[in-house]
Amino acid sequence: MATKLKITWVKSAIGYAKNQKLTVATLGLKKLHQSVLHDDTPAIRGMIRTVNHLVTVEEVEA
């Protein structure tokens, strides 16, 4: 089965660089403590690496 990533926004992006705010939005996160599911791809992993201090990530079997 394909692995998916559950990404949860846990810390506000206020005071951080604009590219980090845009990355949070690109991941599909609109509100704090919201979670989204994404396929485990190198592009998504790169975005997570950019904002790893603002989000938590869990691997989910889908």
UniProtKB/Swiss-Prot annotation:
A Pfam family recorded for this sequence: Ribosomal_L30
GO cellular component assignments: cytosolic large ribosomal subunit
SUPFAM superfamilies named among the record's database cross-references: Ribosomal protein L30p/L7e
Species assigned in the record: Heliobacterium modesticaldum (strain ATCC 51547 / Ice1)
Family of the protein in this entry: Belongs to the universal ribosomal protein uL30 family.
Ribonucleoprotein keyword on record: yes
UniProt cross-references to CDD domains, sorted A to Z: Ribosomal_L30
Domain of life according to the entry: Bacteria
Protein's UniProt name: Large ribosomal subunit protein uL30
